[in-house]
């Protein structure tokens, strides 16, 4: 008995010592994986489903992944398949995924009065894409306060409409759930009671619901670092960091330009006044959230392809959104502009972009487009479906958006597993997973000579 106890203690110490040797990237990946598996285990239980039956593991895992990775693709209608307990579990998973596993664990550490060590600060900075370690504890507190405060305000603003339609207590719950889902850019809804997988189509012309959801999505998608910059510098725009200026300018452009295109190219059967609301909502939700107020499958292929491009771009660094990020798009555009103007280096807001950032932006674009195309081709082969719906589904999963033409519930198990992997990659980050599998930075003792190669 004593020997068995000693062996177990030795195993425990080996596990603890192994965790101490993990780098920040590995801890982030394992943290998300642990929460996902825990959520899947709970969602499998009969208490989580509305009819009291066991949920197949793949469906429970898919739901847990889409919640933690704040995607929104679902294989079961969230509003009708899951019980109230299941809805609460999904909401907690969304909140955990939106804030980040590291941010939540760090918040509990701060509340307990314990000191945050240097290694913990490094992990915290990496998880929210902070440029430096100084002030990371203050930033974490700011993130939690802003998140909970904005979600509460959003819930209170939507409460009158949902309480009118669903009664007081259920209406308050619906308001809270959709506020958290919108701010975290999850796009998961409970409105299946009005039609399976109907999302927000029953509120397509409701100004209050549309505008509140739009604001929540935008606030969550801009990024905590940007809001911290705005909070500290207020109206002194000249003091903003270059990254904040890039995010704000490109976010505005990516909201209004697609909205204008949607208004003139799509939804022609809707009156002009209501079409403005639908076009604006679809422009905002396409890049990050996954809610929809219109039938996407009835759109033209040009409109569908525009949505694919918007999903690929996604939100901003340090936010709850996925995609290659607005800053990556900005760097790529500035690189092209520099080449056209025959400049030595790309520039934005009177600042030069360092070569390492340019190389990273190119690598991210190559990785996301390659993975998206590979996933789309695989889904098309496995499911015998046209390429456009499969490409839409693939980019939606990889960019953690959650929009779909309605094919997700009909997919086979292999296709569901592929989307699970892609949602995980999209939320954690492709580069994070790559760095997590590498032993460390390789120091080059020497460099090869340079030589030019013809391109273009």
Show which residues each predicted segment covers.
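Membrane-proximal intracellular helices of multi-pass ion channels
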Residues: 1-456
């Amino acid at each position: 008995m004593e020997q068995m106890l000693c062996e177990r203690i030795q195993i425990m110490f080996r596990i603890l010592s192994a965790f101490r040797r993990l780098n920040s990237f590995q801890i982030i990946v394992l943290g998300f994986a642990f929460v996902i598996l825990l959520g899947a285990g709970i969602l499998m239980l009969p208490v989580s489903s509305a009819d009291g039956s066991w949920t197949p593991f793949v469906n429970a895992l898919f739901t847990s992944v889409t919640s933690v990775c704040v995607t929104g693709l679902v294989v079961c209608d969230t509003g009708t398949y899951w019980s109230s307990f299941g809805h609460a579990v999904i909401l907690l998973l969304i909140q955990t995924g939106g804030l980040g596993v590291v941010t939540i664990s760090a918040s509990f550490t701060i509340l307990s009065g314990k000191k945050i060590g240097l290694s913990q600060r490094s992990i915290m900075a990496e998880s929210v894409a902070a440029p430096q370690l100084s002030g990371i504890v203050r930033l974490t507190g700011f993130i939690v306060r802003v998140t909970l405060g904005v979600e509460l305000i959003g819930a209170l603003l939507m409460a009158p409409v949902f309480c009118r339609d669903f009664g007081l207590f259920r209406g308050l719950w619906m308001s809270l759930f959709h506020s958290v889902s919108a701010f975290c850019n999850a796009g998961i809804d409970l409105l299946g009671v009005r039609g399976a997988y109907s999302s927000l189509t029953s509120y397509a012309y409701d100004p209050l619901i549309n505008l509140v959801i739009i604001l929540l999505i935008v606030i969550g998608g801009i990024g905590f670092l940007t809001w911290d910059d705005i909070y500290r510098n207020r109206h002194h725009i000249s003091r903003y960091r270059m990254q904040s200026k890039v995010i704000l300018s490109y976010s505005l452009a990516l909201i209004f330009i697609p909205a204008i295109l949607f208004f003139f190219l799509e939804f022609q059967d809707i009156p002009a006044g209501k079409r403005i609301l639908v076009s604006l909502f679809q422009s905002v939700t396409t890049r990050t959230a996954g809610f929809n107020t219109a039938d996407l499958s009835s759109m033209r292929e040009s409109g569908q392809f525009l949505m694919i491009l918007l999903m690929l771009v996604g939100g901003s660094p340090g936010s709850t959104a996925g995609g290659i990020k607005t800053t990556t798009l900005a760097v790529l555009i500035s690189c092209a502009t520099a080449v056209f103007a025959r400049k030595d280096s790309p520039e934005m807001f009177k600042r030069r972009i360092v070569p390492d950032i340019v190389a990273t932006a190119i690598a991210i674009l190559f990785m996301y487009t390659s993975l998206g195309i590979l996933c789309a081709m695989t889904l098309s082969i496995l499911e015998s479906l046209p390429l456009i719906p499969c490409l839409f589904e693939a980019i939606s999963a990889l960019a953690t958006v959650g929009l779909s033409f309605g094919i997700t519930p009909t997919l086979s198990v292999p296709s569901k597993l592929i989307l699970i992997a892609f949602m995980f990659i999209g939320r954690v980050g492709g580069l994070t997973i790559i760095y997590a599998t590498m032993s460390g930075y390789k120091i080059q003792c020497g460099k090869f000579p340079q030589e030019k190669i013809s391109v273009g």
